[in-house]
């Protein structure tokens, strides 16, 4: 059906148990991709527990090759880790052991993804399959900021791609749907092109441009931000920030961000003391008000750093175990971190005061 922005295709499925599924494909005028999602509705009289519900599938790749297309299909993925983001990894289907078996009985699967709130951890939520003989590329990315999975799988000649939310097996995900309730998957952005993986990535990334129209006005122009971390290395002060401001004034920076360390106590490194978030009277003897004023006087908007989800071992908050995440009854601890239980109303109020309250008090933007 036609919409104001493009076209939509709605396909409906149902079974004898009273379960219904609506597949929605959306195309936006002028774009080289489309979106896909699924909506599950429980029309039964009892609740149902979903253990897996994908957002998309593309199949029978490649129709331009005879048989299994030996050594012709390439799988492109983007790997990542902190400070090493976006490494393109290209493997043949044979390297991934996705040739069909002699009997076509079993399904071979290459499943990857991530578990938790970091959307890019080891892999980007992206995959592309290239027919290297005919130079055709199929690609997809997920619009999802939590646990996800992708699967490249094969049982016979055709290769398939599917994915969406991490399922119960991979991501410990399960959702109870009460009678009459519905559940909608995250969107997937899909495309196919004649060209290479760079063109495919351009198509998928370009699909996000329409959503940029809804960002705050201050971000419409992609403002340039100066973050002082690599200048003070976790030791910002009113004095050294004043010197930095003098050096960078008139250089086109719109924001100046005060990074970690503004809260540290004397003799305690910043990376083991986050969590209490009290302004250091030694580093900022006149409080943050004076420093924020200096930033504005130089024509920049002030910003400030928080790492709100965790606490360091030298912070008093580290011992506030009633409100920290636990595993097997004990606080979940790493080498230098414990973590707030973000579902705890006390934590929400505490961070509301320490984070939101600080932003509002000093006028950080």
Q: What does each model-found stretch correspond to?
A:
Residues 175-194:
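Short Pro-Gly-centered flexible turn/kink motifs
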Residues 38, 180, 226, 256, ...:
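Conserved, mostly hydrophobic/aromatic
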Residues 251-264, 351-365:
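Active-site groove signature of glycoside hydrolases
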Residues 27, 50, 263-318:
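Acidic/aromatic-lined carbohydrate-recognition and catalytic surfaces
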Residues 1-156, 171:
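Polysaccharide-binding surfaces and accessory modules of carbohydrate-active proteins
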Residues 159-171:
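Short, structured beta-strand/loop micro-motifs enriched in basic residues and often containing a Trp
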Residues 203-255, 259, 264:
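An acidic-aromatic substrate-binding cleft motif
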Residues 221-223, 230-236, 303, 308-362:
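Active-site-adjacent "subsite" loops/lids of carbohydrate-active enzymes
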